[in-house]
Each structure stands twice: as C-alpha cells, then as structure tokens.
Swiss-Prot record:
Disulfide bonds: none annotated. It comes from Lymantria dispar. Keywords: Repeat, Signal. GO terms for molecular function: structural constituent of egg chorion. It comes from the Eukaryota. This is Chorion class A protein Ld5. Transmembrane segments: none annotated.
Length: 143
C-alpha cells in the first residue's frame, strides 16, 4: 500500500469516527479520571500550569486573553449575524411545508427571481453549549 492510499485510509477512519461519535461533556472524560482538577493536569501545582490550568494555554499566559472569555468558544445559541449569498440558484419544483416552526427574523431576496417571504431564527441550544461543561474550548475552569 503506498503512502497516499494509507493517508486516505487514515482520513476515512477519522471521518467515520467523527460521524459516529458524540461529545456529551468534557467532564465525563476529564474530571472523574483526575486529568483536570484535583491533583491531575488541571491541579494548581506541578502539571497544573498546562493546557487547562488558569495560567496555561487556556488561561492568562503570554498569549493574551483567556481562550474561554475572548477567544475560541462554542456557539451558545444567542446572538445575531448576517449571511450573504450571491450567484445563480436554479430552483424548480414544488415545496410544501407543514407544521409549526417558531422563529423570528427576516430574509431579503433580490435579483431576477420573484420571491418574497420571511424566515427568522431565535432560541438557545438545548445541548448545553457554552454552559460550563460543553463543546469547544469553553471556559478555562471546569465549574
């Protein structure tokens, strides 16, 4: 097997692992095994000044602000943003939508297509994102 085929097999294995995995919490893996907190890697002494400690990569080191407060973090489901799409969108057929979708906001359409309507999105993630133990880097402290 040449190296390119081996690379493709490794990439496929990572994709399969990503598809069939579920991240429920960092605490389930880290906190009860002593990796973070207590006397593990997140402890205040020894290796505690590593990745997850207050003065490590996620904390107040020489890298600027802590990652949890001002840097990389999971989307908490609260906020507002703009999306712009440009290009040709050939659409044909019939679309039927039934049911209740409680959303708030608006969508603007422009161009050669005669379209009108409104779409809005409001809410908060039910998965607990940005709530202490969540997805992403989050807060430097597992509280």
């Amino acid at each position: 097997m040449n190296s390119f085929a081996l690379l493709l097999v490794c990439i496929q294995a990572c994709l399969v692992q990503s598809v069939f995995s579920q991240c429920t919490s960092r605490a389930a893996v880290a906190a009860d095994r002593g990796i973070i907190g207590g006397y593990g890697l997140g402890a205040p002494c020894g290796l505690g000044y590593g990745l997850e400690a207050p003065y490590g990569w996620a904390g107040y080191a020489d890298y600027g602000y802590p990652a949890g407060a001002y840097g990389i973090d999971a989307y908490g489901g609260i906020g507002e943003g703009n999306v712009a799409v440009a290009g040709e969108l050939p659409v044909a057929g019939t679309t039927a939508v039934a049911g209740q979708v409680p959303i708030m906001g608006a969508v603007k359409f422009g161009g050669d297509v005669c379209a009108a309507g409104s779409v809005s999105i409001a809410g908060k993630c039910a998965c607990g994102c940005x709530e202490g133990y969540g997805y992403g880097l989050g807060s430097p402290y597992l509280y």
